Structure formats: structure tokens, C-alpha cells
Amino acid sequence: MELCVVRHTKPRIESGLCYGRLDLELEEGFCQQAERISQSLPLPFDLTYCSPLKRCTQLADYLGLSYRRDPRIREIDFGEWEGKRWDQIGKAAIDAWHADLCSYRFPGGESFGDLCDRVDDFLTSLPNKNILLITHAGVIKALHHLVEGVSIEAAAEFSV
């Protein structure tokens, strides 16, 4: 199986807000970034899978791709933190998360380990084909762990 992974371009959201499952559209100027992505894709693909969140489907639609939506490649669920300013979440909560990046479960959400389990389930269901994924930073970090064998802690800190 050949896997090509693309992260959505910058979403339309106020700087400094926590977002994962928030269903955000892309910034108005996303077309320029999308054109660069389009030019760099090693086409064709047998299948394209896309997160069902708008910021991914909007990019796939702009690129003119036929795709399947799959909820297993949605971004991590930050639960009660979604849409809050990082400075409103509180230092103690953020420190607890940073102390245990793999297992810390966001209140009302999921942990990075949960995300990895979800992405692993997705990976094992894929056919042996040339596949494009349009997804999120958290999913790409999980793939870094699952496909490349990087420790889960290192994958959680991987910059996308």
C-alpha cells in the first residue's frame, strides 16, 4: 500500500483558540495553498479518504477529488476545551496534559492513545492500493507512530 497524507490548510478561526472537532471552514485565502498542494500530489490515486470535517472536505472539493468520508480520521476530540482560549483552560490542566501526552484524556473528549487506536482501526481496514488521505495534524501524528514506529510520546510531540 502507498499512502500519501495531506493536512488541511489553515482554518478560519481566531488565533489562540483550542480546536480539534470544531467543524471549521478554511480561511478565505486557502486557494493559493490548495494550488501548491495540487501541484505536488503524485497523482493518480486509487482511493481518497477524507475527514468529514469541513476544513478537509472543502480542500478535497476544491482539488476536484472524488473521496470517501471516514470519521476515524477526524481530528482529536478536545472535549470541553474545544473553542476555548488556551489561556482560559488553565495552567494546571495544560501541565497535566503535557506530563502525559499519550494517556491524558481531555475532559469530555479523548486521549492521544484513543486517537491512535481509532487511526489504527482505519489503517487495518485499508485495501492494498495507492491511497490519499486528507486529514488533520493529530491524525498525522498518530500515523507517524503507527506507520513509522516512532514512540507514541515522540509522535505526540511531532510538529506537523
Regions found by a protein language model. Give the residues of each.
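Active-site catalytic pocket residues across diverse enzymes, especially alpha/beta-hydrolases
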Residues: 63, 147, 151
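Glycine-rich phosphate-binding loop signature in dinucleotide/nucleotide-binding domains
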Residues: 41-44, 125-129
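Short beta-strand scaffold positions
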Residues: 50-51, 117, 134-135
